[in-house]
Regions:
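A short, flexible loop at the N-terminus of ABC-type nucleotide-binding domains that lies
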Residues: 1-20, 25-26, 31
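The feature captures the beta-strand-to-loop junction immediately N-terminal to the Walker
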Residues: 33-35
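Helix-to-loop junction immediately C-terminal to a conserved catalytic motif
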Residues: 48
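ABC-family P-loop ATPase nucleotide-binding domains
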Residues: 78-135
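Catalytic Walker B motif of ABC-type/P-loop ATPase nucleotide-binding domains
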Residues: 148-152
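ABC transporter nucleotide-binding domain
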Residues: 164-180, 184-243
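Conserved small/polar residues in nucleotide/adenosyl-binding loops
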Residues: 256-260
Length: 260
């Protein structure tokens, strides 16, 4: 279980990047949504133990992640957008890095690389952006960490590779795993997610499973911005918004309105 308890963070000489974020995140795939500057990457860095909160806590199985205990760091992996991998090849990188993750599954890595059509002996610096991203995703998924944090994983992938990535995640995620995917393009993962995290100006507005979302919030499109909306984006002259659901019935999840 991943828990956020009144988590706050501010960069030097700047406004708060994250304000009083609280949530309990269980197993499954969660999409992390928000505009540029909303605080998505900051939140992922805090979850990964790469930043220290100004106040509050981020806990994994009850332990503060900021303490960076080796036993906790073995359970978390963060893959940033365009994050460099040291080593000339995937094989070489695995020899240097995978030893720190006891759950690493070399057969799964080989299987995913094969499905992506990647030779593990190929030089990383000779790969295209999309191929290098697929190699990195294959490695990240093969670690089988309890928490996997992916920042814009679909960037640089073509349509067929995005579809294959979805299939690979669905086939290999376990009930104990939590995968959090930061994305601007919900369509890339529209059939995949079990829950949503929505950030706006550093505020965590929504942190719920899909079942909870259908009861608590609604997705609307209107010619005027809805009063009291949790999130609003103007698209093609209309206002797509997430609002509180004040009715007695569940609403459908609108993937179009979620494309932030």
């Amino acid at each position: 279980m991943l828990e956020l308890r009144r988590l706050k963070f501010a960069y030097r000489k700047g406004a708060e990047a994250l304000t009083n974020a609280s949530a309990s995140i269980g197993g499954g795939v969660y999409l992390l949504l928000g505009e540029n500057g909303a605080g998505k990457t900051t939140l992922l860095h805090l979850m990964a133990g790469l930043l220290y909160p100004g106040s509050g806590e981020c806990l994994l199985n009850g332990d503060p992640i900021a303490a960076r205990r080796p036993s906790d760091m073995q359970r978390i992996f963060f893959l940033g957008d365009n994050m460099p991998f040291p080593g000339r090849t995937i094989d070489e990188f695995v020899k240097m890095h995978a030893q720190f993750f006891p759950t690493f599954d070399p057969q799964l890595l080989a299987d995913i690389l094969g499905r992506f059509g990647i030779n593990p002996a190929e030089r990383l610096d000779g790969m295209s952006l999309g191929t290098r991203k697929k190699a990195q995703l294959a490695y990240a998924l093969s670690l089988r960490t309890q928490v996997l944090l992916l920042d814009e994983p679909a960037n640089g992938l073509d349509i067929s590779s995005k579809k294959l990535l979805q299939e690979i995640i669905v086939e290999n995620i376990t009930e104990e795993q939590t995968i959090i995917v930061s994305t601007h393009t919900v369509w890339d993962f529209k059939n995949l997610f079990d829950g949503l995290l929505v950030l706006n100006h550093g505020q965590l507005l929504v942190a719920s499973t899909v079942d909870e979302i259908l009861v608590r919030i609604a997705f609307v499109s209107a010619s005027e911005p809805p009063v009291g909306a949790l999130y609003i984006e103007r698209v093609a002259g209309r206002f797509n918004a997430i609002v509180k659901n004040d009715g007695d019935t569940d609403t459908a999840v609108s993937y179009t309105h979620l494309t932030l």
